[in-house]
Amino acid sequence: MENTPQDDLGHARLWYEAIQQFGYTEESLLFESNPEDFQHSTLVELPFKKGDWADAVVRAYLYDVAEDIRLSALENSSYEIIRDRTSTIQGEEDYHVEHAQSWIERMVLDDDAVGRVQAALNRLYPYALTLFEPVGDVESDIEAFGIRTMSLDEMHTAWENRVEEFLTGLNLDVPTDAEVAEHIGRDNNHTDDWAPLFEEMTSSYRNLDRNKATVIMDKDNE
């Protein structure tokens, strides 16, 4: 499981590099922004239930299926730089989905674990719905410029169908009638857990007085 966040950090860096052409830097967007400026889904800022492996696995599954669908919608983007990065990332994301599915399939075979999987699904599903909420008023531009080939509603439907088919096949009850979580995140409205998480996430950068993110290899030597 530890390989997945390492992959995702690498993917994030690819996207940060892609927008540098517009005058942004990874440092300014990530480490030097204020926590209230972030517009991500609140699914990723919720604390894990201590000792609950089901929570981690279900969260990974719900997120990775959404990410897989989003990447599919970017494969034929009108922007070459997006298409190129999508092809690089897609293979690893396919593995992430398979890995999460494999763990869920194994856990539902245990009477105790299946209850924890269901509880995690009930808790996390409303927050997973926030992955398909719009960010500001840019959604119409995303569609108009051909950046994505699917709308958020289409991606949501594809995600829900895929998640429901897999999980109901394991005799899990998918809460498809759940309302989206109160705190969406993509509208800058975060949970109380986000500010302390951001503080921890950026503490090394601040305490070490860094002004440039560390890279393993210079871009010219890749």
Language model feature labels by segment:
Residues T4, A56, A60, I89, ...:
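Amphipathic alpha-helix face/heptad-repeat signature
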Residues E32-A60, D110-D111, L124-T149:
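Acidic/His metal-coordination segments adjacent to aromatic residues that form catalytic metal sites
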Residues D52, A56, R85, A113-R116, ...:
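Non-transmembrane, amphipathic alpha-helical segments
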